[in-house]
Design a protein with these regions (language model features):
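Glycine-rich loop motifs involved in handling phospho/adenylate chemistry
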Residues: 21-31, 54-62
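Conserved catalytic core of two-component sensor histidine kinases
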Residues: 36
Length: 76
């Protein structure tokens, strides 16, 4: 799943390498518009619905936190 998430991130911001980054927002790699695009794309690609209450920077800080969010959303 991490590979798929990285591919999605690169579609949104192809100029960055996302592997091994601790916090995409602290590094200036993603902004709030990118976050909304990411949520929409994750919903579509993984057939999930990310709750508005889950749209927090810490849930999208890095590949691992995004993967955990997707896994939680699949269980709902």
């Amino acid at each position: 799943m991490q590979k798929q998430i990285i591919e999605i991130l690169k579609e949104i911001r192809p100029e960055f390498e996302f592997e091994g980054v601790e916090n995409f927002f602290d590094e200036g790699m993603l902004d709030s518009f990118d976050l909304m695009t990411l949520v929409s794309t994750l919903d579509e690609r993984f057939s999930i619905k990310i709750d508005g209450t889950d749209i927090l920077p810490e849930n999208f800080a890095n590949v691992e936190s995004i993967e955990a969010l997707v896994q939680r959303s699949k269980k709902r």
